[in-house]
Curated annotation (Swiss-Prot):
Pfam families the record matches: Formyl_trans_C (PF02911), Formyl_trans_N (PF00551)
Entry keyword Transferase: yes
InterPro entries, per database record: Fmt, Formyl_trans_C, Formyl_transf_N, Formyl_transf_N_sf, Formyl_transferase-like_C_sf, GART_AS, Met-tRNA-FMT_C, Met-tRNA-FMT_N
Protein name: Methionyl-tRNA formyltransferase
Chain residues that bind (6S)-5,6,7,8-tetrahydrofolate: 111-114
CDD domains: FMT_core_Met-tRNA-FMT_N, Met_tRNA_FMT_C
NCBIfam families, alphabetized: fmt
Function per UniProt: Attaches a formyl group to the free amino group of methionyl-tRNA(fMet). The formyl group appears to play a dual role in the initiator identity of N-formylmethionyl-tRNA by promoting its recognition by IF2 and preventing the misappropriation of this tRNA by the elongation apparatus.
Catalytic activity entry: L-methionyl-tRNA(fMet) + (6R)-10-formyltetrahydrofolate = N-formyl-L-methionyl-tRNA(fMet) + (6S)-5,6,7,8-tetrahydrofolate + H(+)
Lineage: Bacteria, Pseudomonadati, Campylobacterota, Epsilonproteobacteria, Campylobacterales
Amino acid sequence: MKKIIFMGTPSYATCILKALVENENFKLVALFTQPDKAVGRKQILTPSDTKAFLSQNYPSIPIFTPSSLKDENIMRQIKDLNPDFIVVAAYGKILPKAILDLAPCVNLHASLLPKYRGASPIQSAILNKDEKSGVCTMLMEEGLDTGAILESLECDIKDKNSSEVFELLANLAAKLILSTLLNFDKITPKKQEESLATLCRKIKKEDGLINLQNARELYQKYLAFTPWPGVFLENGLKFLELELVDELKQNAKMGEILELEKESFLLACKQGVLRIKKLQESGKKALDGRTYLNGKRLKSEDSLC
């Protein structure tokens, strides 16, 4: 039975953690995750998704939430656990070389490397209109997502939002990590092709700011930034549900309401047309498109904003 230290934080990582802890070939000896964070208006201290899952279902397995992995006591604790593998999935911290040298460190990255190294591979793939994505296991080294690839699985992501793709890739990653660890000695690591490498940065709230220039680009932003940070106009109006109706039509009036429907309306971008199904003003409740227009006394040929 191989001893595993798992390092991960969000729900994506929990799916992988669950697969490992339930498999009879592995023994989870510890979880490393981010410290509890203050959440919401009341700033309630909340554990990470992985910590909540493990403490509720497997309370005997130790959980560590260090602010730094460079602490000598943390290094010693990891060494004393004597892991056969260290598995990392969306942990949120860089592993120092001293830890990388203790055991094979296998990272699960939510892209088909070397594309989209970095913090937002799923959102970046959607923004770039990729129809395929996937997950891969790689041997970690000091560079950011630069290690040799062990195995990968791909899937279709066309017209899926980030939330849906996260769930899809989490389930793929849970299968992939079992395959990689069980067959580790038989796998020949494959060096990444540096000429094909692309980088992606962390998503910020302001990335959700949109204009009505291009319907296709707005639609891809909507998919990429659901559920967070969402998409919103400069006046704070959020588009919660929308569909791409036409991506080529040139419209004379950007922001014109083209047609009212039962629970939605068609909106003109400078190029293309969107169906707005649900929207929300800042500080107010969400409304379907038609109800919102009725409340604002807006009709066909009026400007939304």
